[in-house]
């Protein structure tokens, strides 16, 4: 193989091509690749930030939901306690009112019983007086007195 001027000219043309490519073609390509790499890195960083923000937001939401659940449970428990207290108070009032009514009814029944006894005593006294009066008006005879006593018993 012989080295001649064509090889030198081709080497010079190649070096000119390399220099031209390094000066005018390679910088825009490298710049485009760097910009693309930067955009990808920025996108990944934004995705990481969004992911961490989402995680923080989820934690805040979970915390607020937990607080809301606790507040709701506390309010329900308080309402249930109030309702139970109202029910107990109503039961106590109803029992007290019932006891008053029973006591009043007993007192009224006792009073009526006393009045009935007094009326019965008065009637017995009247009948006894009538019976004694009739016995004293008639002659003393066992048969007659027995009849009067039977009649007196039926009247009582």
Curated annotation (Swiss-Prot):
<keyword id="KW-1003">Cell membrane</keyword>
<keyword id="KW-0406">Ion transport</keyword>
<dbReference type="Pfam" id="PF00430">
    <property type="entry name" value="ATP-synt_B"/>
</dbReference>
<comment type="function">
    <text>Component of the F(0) channel, it forms part of the peripheral stalk, linking F(1) to F(0).</text>
</comment>
<dbReference type="GO" id="GO:0045259">
    <property type="term" value="C:proton-transporting ATP synthase complex"/>
</dbReference>
<comment type="similarity">
    <text>Belongs to the ATPase B chain family.</text>
</comment>
<keyword id="KW-0813">Transport</keyword>
<dbReference type="InterPro" id="IPR028987">
    <property type="entry name" value="ATP_synth_B-like_membr_sf"/>
</dbReference>
<keyword id="KW-0375">Hydrogen ion transport</keyword>
<keyword id="KW-1133">Transmembrane helix</keyword>
<keyword id="KW-0812">Transmembrane</keyword>
<dbReference type="GO" id="GO:0005886">
    <property type="term" value="C:plasma membrane"/>
</dbReference>
<keyword id="KW-0066">ATP synthesis</keyword>
<comment type="subunit">
    <text>F-type ATPases have 2 components, F(1) - the catalytic core - and F(0) - the membrane proton channel. F(1) has five subunits: alpha(3), beta(3), gamma(1), delta(1), epsilon(1). F(0) has three main subunits: a(1), b(2) and c(10-14). The alpha and beta chains form an alternating ring which encloses part of the gamma chain. F(1) is attached to F(0) by a central stalk formed by the gamma and epsilon chains, while a peripheral stalk is formed by the delta and b chains.</text>
</comment>
<comment type="function">
    <text>F(1)F(0) ATP synthase produces ATP from ADP in the presence of a proton or sodium gradient. F-type ATPases consist of two structural domains, F(1) containing the extramembraneous catalytic core and F(0) containing the membrane proton channel, linked together by a central stalk and a peripheral stalk. During catalysis, ATP synthesis in the catalytic domain of F(1) is coupled via a rotary mechanism of the central stalk subunits to proton translocation.</text>
</comment>
<feature type="transmembrane region" description="Helical">
    <location>
        <begin position="7"/>
        <end position="27"/>
    </location>
</feature>
<dbReference type="InterPro" id="IPR050059">
    <property type="entry name" value="ATP_synthase_B_chain"/>
</dbReference>
<dbReference type="GO" id="GO:0046933">
    <property type="term" value="F:proton-transporting ATP synthase activity, rotational mechanism"/>
</dbReference>
<dbReference type="GO" id="GO:0046961">
    <property type="term" value="F:proton-transporting ATPase activity, rotational mechanism"/>
</dbReference>
<keyword id="KW-0472">Membrane</keyword>
<keyword id="KW-0997">Cell inner membrane</keyword>
<keyword id="KW-0138">CF(0)</keyword>
<dbReference type="InterPro" id="IPR002146">
    <property type="entry name" value="ATP_synth_b/b'su_bac/chlpt"/>
</dbReference>
<dbReference type="InterPro" id="IPR005864">
    <property type="entry name" value="ATP_synth_F0_bsu_bac"/>
</dbReference>
<protein>
    <recommendedName>
        <fullName>ATP synthase subunit b</fullName>
    </recommendedName>
</protein>
